[in-house]
Structures are given as C-alpha cells and as structure tokens.
C-alpha cells in the first residue's frame, strides 16, 4: 500500500509506519523501541516499550519492562509539529540497592499501571528522519512486595503507592517507513 498524502504545504508523505527509540532511556542503559502508525491524517497510534535487564555489582538492580500505548491527535497533520496524546502504562519491576526513591537498603518487586496526557513536538530532519520531544503527566498505581536489599533478603511485606506527576519524558529519533 502506498503512503497517504499529506495536506498542502508539507514536503513529506504520511508514513505507513514509524520506528523510534528514546535517547533518554539509552542514557540509563534501558533498551527501548516504539512503533507509530496512522489511524487518520491527524490521528496516530503509538506503542512504546522499554526493558532494563541488568543487575550490577552487589546485586544492585533497576530491572523493569514496560508497555505504553498512546493515541495522538496532531494539530496540523500526522508526524509533524505539535500533538496531544492520551496513554496507558503497564510495567513490571525488580529494583533495589540503588540510591533512588528510598531503595538504597530495600528491594521492591511488583507492577505499576496508570494513564496520562502527553504533549509533544516533532521536527523533520530529513526525508525519513525526525526528532520528537514529549512529556506527559498522569496517575500511576504501584503494587509491590518489599524485601531487605541483599541476595535472598528477608521479606518485609506488601505495599502500594499512588502517584500523580510525570509519566513520560522523551527525546526520540524516528524513522519513517513509507
């Protein structure tokens, strides 16, 4: 199937599919990829995924996997300029021994889920390449089991947290498949 045509005034055809990666995830050694496809000339569906499988010395870890589908409404036309999005998020995690969010002497294992609203902008930098910046705010709920941080650490109980705040931030490099 041929790529859809863009409205008058744009130089690039609407892509069938875009593949992207978030540079901010790579800064934390987290593998990630995203896929975006059009549903209408100004609407798209994005599926982002991330994964961090690493355990560091002394059993320190910030392991996770996540999936984050999002529906976007582009102000001008798809894959160029400003957009608003609504997303869901589901993730699993196993993290501890890191000086972040009170995990220096604890390990947390569980899942989180939530939803948010995103704003972003995409700049074309070539016929098929573009750079996207995005940020989102929303709600997350985390259900977890807590342990003393060390290998086979003592079980400390279950817990949950509700969170309102940033749910997504990204600077992504996008490649269009026409």
Show which residues each predicted segment covers.
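Internal, hydrophobic beta-strand segments that form the core of beta-sheet-rich folds
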Residues: 133-139
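Gram-negative (and chloroplast) outer-membrane scaffold detector with strong preference
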Residues: 37-133, 174-175
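Cleavable N-terminal export/targeting peptides
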Residues: 1-12, 177-178
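Outer-membrane beta-barrel "beta-signal"
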Residues: 163-178
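Extracytoplasmic loops and strand-loop junctions of Gram-negative outer membrane beta-barrel proteins
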Residues: 15-18, 53, 99-104, 152-158
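Transmembrane beta-barrel architecture of outer-membrane proteins
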Residues: 16-18, 28-30, 64-68, 112-116, ...
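A short acidic/glycine-rich loop-to-helix N-cap element
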Residues: 144-146, 153-162
């Amino acid at each position: 199937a041929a790529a859809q045509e863009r409205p008058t005034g744009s130089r690039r055809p609407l892509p069938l599919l875009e593949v992207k990666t978030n540079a901010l995830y790579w800064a934390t050694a987290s593998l990630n990829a995203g896929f975006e496809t059009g549903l209408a000339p100004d609407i798209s569906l994005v599926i982002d995924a991330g994964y961090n499988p690493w355990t560091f010395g002394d059993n320190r870890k910030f392991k996770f996997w996540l999936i984050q589908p999002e529906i976007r409404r582009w102000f001008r036309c798809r894959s160029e300029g400003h957009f608003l999005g609504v997303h869901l998020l589901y993730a699993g995690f196993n993290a501890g021994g890191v000086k972040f969010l009170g995990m220096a002497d604890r390990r947390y294992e569980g899942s989180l889920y939530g939803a948010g609203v995103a704003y972003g902008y995409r700049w074309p930098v070539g016929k098929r390449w573009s750079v996207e910046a995005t940020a989102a705010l929303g709600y997350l709920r985390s259900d977890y089991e807590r342990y003393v941080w060390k290998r086979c650490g003592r079980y400390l109980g279950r817990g949950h947290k509700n969170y309102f705040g940033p749910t997504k931030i990204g600077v992504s490099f996008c490649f269009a498949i026409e």
